[in-house]
Design a protein with these regions (language model features):
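Beta-strand C-termini and the immediately following turn/loop, strongest in propeller blades
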Residues: 1-2, 176
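Adenine nucleotide phosphate-binding catalytic loops in nucleotide-utilizing enzymes
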Residues: 119-126, 156-253
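Phosphate-binding loop of NTP-binding sites
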Residues: 2-146, 150-159, 210, 216-217
């Protein structure tokens, strides 16, 4: 654990009878008192949740956010809003932590087996994600990457959408890559936003961006705000993070 049981400060709080909760339990409480927008998945969740948080934070809606990486836009993994009903959360599957959550909406990016020291088998790992989908609140939505080996088990009243780079209810079209830039058109069931520039022009961010934009679109972030937010997104520290980028040398931290 990050803090051993014999740590002096932890021992003090135990001795004085304070209630002590894990981070995941606290986040669960927060999702039951706000509209939790949670991003789960083996990989892609940190970038996607940070991107979604930026889309909301720079819009007229705003958000609170608890992220798994340091946003390069804000220099922190915590965003606070006094007025927004939305909380963007990176939903961590380690130790089944995401089972404490009660999402209003959730993205699932990937279900490649991981943390097998906890889960033991691929089947147990997938079952954990299936159970997670049962926690989404009626009236909310699941946005799941198209083609995953996961059968969602959502409650009645939960909408299910698919997404990916090239197909699904939400996807990208007219992808243009050149001169160090990426432009896409974002396609949703009820709209299309043309000529979106990715602030971090990396191929995988097309798919991550589609998921983040889907979450934003379904919750009232305007087309123009989405377009501006994607262009101004600067990425996440140590997630395909360019430290040196010259004509002779590229050095990445990831």
């Amino acid at each position: 654990p990050a803090i051993p049981q014999e740590h002096a400060e932890l021992a003090y709080f135990h001795e004085k009878g304070f209630e002590i909760q894990k981070r995941s339990q606290v986040l669960g409480t927060i999702t039951r008192s706000s509209k939790g927008l949670c991003v789960a998945g083996t990989h892609g969740k940190t970038t996607t949740s940070t991107m979604a948080a930026h889309l909301f934070h720079q819009s007229h809606i705003g958000c609170t956010a608890f992220l798994g990486g340091i946003s390069k836009n804000y220099g922190t993994n915590l965003l606070l809003s006094q007025t927004s009903p939305y909380t963007v959360i990176e939903a961590d599957e380690f130790d089944r932590s995401f089972h404490w959550l009660s999402p209003y909406m959730s993205v699932i990016t990937a279900t490649d087996p991981d943390h097998l020291d906890i889960y033991g088998t691929r089947e147990a790992y997938l079952e954990s994600f299936r159970h997670y989908t049962t926690l989404i609140q009626p009236g909310g939505a699941l946005i799941i990457r198209k083609g995953l080996a996961l059968q969602p088990d959502v409650q009645p009243g939960v909408r299910v959408y698919t997404y990916s780079r090239d197909e699904g209810d939400f996807h990208a079209e007219n992808i243009r890559i050149g001169n160090g830039e990426i432009f896409i058109d974002f396609v949703a069931p009820d709209t299309r936003i043309n000529d979106i520039r990715l602030g971090v022009p990396i191929g995988i961010n097309i798919e991550n961006g589609v998921a983040a934009m889907a979450l934003a679109h379904l919750n009232g972030v305007t087309d123009e705000e989405i377009k501006q937010g994607m262009a101004s997104f600067r990425g996440v520290d140590r997630r395909f993070d360019f430290k040196i980028k010259t004509s002779r040398l590229v050095f990445l931290s990831d």
